[in-house]
């Protein structure tokens, strides 16, 4: 039976930590664990998900919940309430619903103070890891039978009815993910016509019906070249010499978005080496199964620009293809032959590996994310199959694996700190401080221990890194990568908790550590007044013309984001209240410029585009909160009035809100097709309206929405998993499994605190 271990570093000498593994979460299979009843519960959950996989495509993350609720002997002792038509919403009913939610949410907390949860959804994450382990000869040791079974379960659970796989679990089938998952099944032991419900045959038919494997997008071409199914001539050039360019150039790596930089860094190494794994009998079979003509007869260079229409979200501009062709025809032949292969190529490869090792060491071999992690593992193995770097990478693989009722997947990377910072604020909003004191104490300790205390090592600027001292990451301290909104939300938590008695919530954070957090937020503000996510946004935006990834957008350079800007405003306004003299003028200027940015980013319909949540509902909640925190009101700010109008006009018949993930991709508001609202998005809208003072004008829309949330609460005190509500790079959706617990609780808390405590009963 699968068990989640918290804060466990294991006994591998190749793993190390900066904070004793606080926040680390790793799954382990124990054949002797679990009673027959517990195993039956898990099997029932698996079967239920599979039977309903086309109705609700995101899992409910039940295996961890089963485990922790059992360990803590959880039983919901507070009876539920339901609000009937025309019945009044009383403070008592809301308080009961809140206490049920808090009781359940508190039980889900781990011993080190965070809330473990799934953070996944893309379907191109896991197959490359399987490919990497196959190529390096470590497939059997890393993925024994029970692991393979769960990986395959996940693949089967998320195969679309047409036989393909989407970019994410709710997406339409695309060539990239269908090819990757087909090959993954074959490597894991399924025959050409094997797999559950003819999974392999159906997938192969989809591939051939949509232009064949040569129409896979660029990342697919790279991985198939590594495997030996394609020739490297099918890939556009990724010369490692790029990393030797002078820093004054506009297209220097230092000016790239960190994720783009750290994906193409190991890719350029593999390309520069033209690395190909062992050509095994299976690889030869895959060539026959996927290609429509013999491998030797394929004109590989003509496939470079092929891409299935289903994959094509960001078509390459003509200028980009011209550059690829120029590099392919004129530059690469020079760099791969004497004397340039000795003078430049070998030196460039060494430079790239220097950067890879630096990034690995500064993230404790977690790396910035799962896509980069797998590529860096392979690059380290290619450089030295017996080297320490490869061994250290393997030791950190468990940090990415997650098991749910739909099988085993890879996290983007954990959301430990992000989730904890939101939950703390939700619990504080309940005003049930005596009920949640011990929970807040542990969470407070986790947040304090998770702050990054140092900048990256050595001359970090020469390695294209920004300061990180005082920041918080998305996951845990060991990860090391500063994130602006995670820093702002965690700083806000520390400030809020410092205002409560230490005997209830623990000792407050030292002021110097708070100052460090303020420093990093101030350092990140861009020219437009907004905040990027990771590093200063210094590059020109037209560099996006060179985005080589067909299925993502705004991936080349760092941008300024509404959500990050709002979080920073809220944190710095509170900081200014508690520490009014620290960098006073700079903080005031920051807030003023950030407000102007939020007003500038508002769309014509009054909404704000959300970059990290779906979509205009999410962005509008953040923007309204930021503007109000800065002192703006409905009466004195046209942006708030327009934002409120947008939310009111998108409220649905059942009282809630429901926005499709297509809003993110199409960049226009698209409602959910089904009539039922999304509880998480409803919660965002409620909080946005409350902060904008809707209760003072007409509270009826709020009452209708809260009634929906109360009536949707489940027996144990949580809410059901519905559609995905996270997103990145415009087109790829992400599941935050804790959102269904966090935001309804938070919205009810704000409603009770700001409305009902002043009005004993409300008729709707």
Curated annotation (Swiss-Prot):
The record's active-site residues are 485 (proton donor)
Might you give the EC number(s) for this enzyme?
5.4.99.39, 5.4.99.40
Name of the molecule in the record = Mixed-amyrin synthase
PFTB repeats mapped onto the chain: 148-189, 514-556, 591-631, 640-681
The chain's disulfide connectivity reads none
- CDD domains, alphabetically? SQCY_1
- Species per Swiss-Prot/TrEMBL record: Pisum sativum
Gene Ontology molecular-function annotations: alpha-amyrin synthase activity; beta-amyrin synthase activity
Q: Name one GO cellular component term.
A: lipid droplet
**Reactions accelerated catalytically:** (S)-2,3-epoxysqualene = beta-amyrin; (S)-2,3-epoxysqualene = alpha-amyrin
Q: What does this protein do?
A: Multifunctional oxidosqualene cyclase producing alpha- and beta-amyrin and several other minor triterpenes.
Q: What is stated as this protein's family in its record? A: Belongs to the terpene cyclase/mutase family.
Q: Which GO terms describe its biological process?
A: pentacyclic triterpenoid biosynthetic process
Q: What class of enzyme is it?
A: isomerase
Gene symbol?
OSCPSM
Q: Which domain of life is it from?
A: Eukaryota
